[in-house]
Amino acid sequence: MVRTGRMQAWPDAGKYMTNPPGLSREGAEFLAKGGAITIGADNHCVEQAPSADPENWQVVHTYLLAEAGIPMMEIVNLEELAGEKIYEYVFFGACIKLRGATGSPMRPVAMPLKN
């Protein structure tokens, strides 16, 4: 999970959606090569925007989904975990099964590993 702090701008759409901080392709590669099986973030696109590559406006999506086969979660509210200084947890997401869809709403659950 990547907490950029962007969720603090919610629900102000103008602030939340404009030029979000996030992962670069290099950051995504680092996480993928480190063994990440899914990557989530508190912004609306996981990656930083605008893109550093004028030819590809979603370089992290391209890399994670098409090249590395790693799914992403967007708009994950990590503020409560951060506020309680919970950095190690078991995470699972209960997704709605939608036939033919490329995404789904999810109920995220984080179970702390340490007190």
Across the structure, where does each feature detected by a protein language model lie?
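Active-/binding-site microenvironments in catalytic and ligand-binding cores
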Residues: 1-115
